[in-house]
Amino acid sequence: MPLHHLTRFPRLEFIGAPTPLEYLPRLSDYLGREIYIKRDDVTPIAMGGNKLRKLEFLVADALREGADTLITAGAIQSNHVRQTAAVAAKLGLHCVALLENPIGTTAENYLTNGNRLLLDLFNTQIEMCDALTDPDAQLQTLATRIEAQGFRPYVIPVGGSSALGAMGYVESALEIAQQCEEVVGLSSVVVASGSAGTHAGLAVGLEHLMPDVELIGVTVSRSVAEQKPKVIALQQAIAGQLALTATADIHLWDDYFAPGYGVPNDAGMEAVKLLASLEGVLLDPVYTGKAMAGLIDGISQKRFNDDGPILFIHTGGAPALFAYHPHV
């Protein structure tokens, strides 16, 4: 795989050493299958999470362009917005966050606790909107207004999910391949599939590094029919920028996100409690809980290609546990 193409893109180092890849012995015994976990929840900044991998590339590009302000968007409890704001604070940049309330709740914990509380600690400028119906256009409109105030804004898309941001998960695939070498022969990888950048970056990287490994994206906000074109579009854009081919099919399961994005469900919450009680690992109600519910049910329903070891990508999100109390 011509990874030298990745060096063409400016990159800041926020993460340092590879995140741990760990065996989960008690969960493995419980499920009757070898389960491993990639701990992107323990990245170093602001309670961790996967978006730092994307921000290493995106914020480097922002600084190259001379930006002094990062603008992004997401839900009130967005992990991506929290990590973007933290990076901005670390680098002395201004951060403007365009937020929506996707579940229409008036619950005080959701509106003020968890990730939203952390945004205030990072001195984030908050702009509320009724809904992110066209986030790219809404972010551009906001950037124009911020620029008129004398700032030099750089727009980071929802979830950091552009071809540039997703380079972080092409690199993650290399990290996984190196960590698994001569240790475990993975059969499948499971990841939450939302804004699609993490999923697409892994798809490109794993196709070239571990082509026999099955990659399953568990959707957290959309049906397969809605999500698959988003993942494929990013997959092809990433491959194009790296001068690679990307022919691997995109596998998605959409049975686990109902009743909708950001709304906890019973299977997801059971998965959160199971990982906490068996392994001391904290999942969240929005992304990783639902993705783990998919992994658990996938084993039960024999949905995986074979009975080999499974790697779960832990993308973070634990701050949302506090926002979703008393569901937790």
Curated annotation (Swiss-Prot):
The keyword Cytoplasm does not apply. The keyword Lyase applies. One of its GO terms (molecular function) is D-cysteine desulfhydrase activity. Keywords: Lyase, Pyridoxal phosphate. InterPro entries: ACCD_DCysDesulf, D-Cys_desShydrase, D_Cys_desulphydr_bac, TrpB-like_PALP, TrpB-like_PALP_sf. The modification N6-(pyridoxal phosphate)lysine is found at K51. Transmembrane segments: none annotated. One of its GO terms (biological process) is D-amino acid metabolic process. It catalyses: D-cysteine + H2O = hydrogen sulfide + pyruvate + NH4(+) + H(+). Its cofactor is pyridoxal 5'-phosphate. It holds the Pfam family PALP. Coiled coil: none annotated. Its EC number is 4.4.1.15. Homodimer. Belongs to the ACC deaminase/D-cysteine desulfhydrase family. PANTHER family: 1-AMINOCYCLOPROPANE-1-CARBOXYLATE DEAMINASE-RELATED (PTHR43780:SF2). Catalyzes the alpha,beta-elimination reaction of D-cysteine and of several D-cysteine derivatives. It could be a defense mechanism against D-cysteine. This is D-cysteine desulfhydrase. The lineage of its organism: Bacteria, Pseudomonadati, Pseudomonadota, Gammaproteobacteria, Enterobacterales. The gene is dcyD.
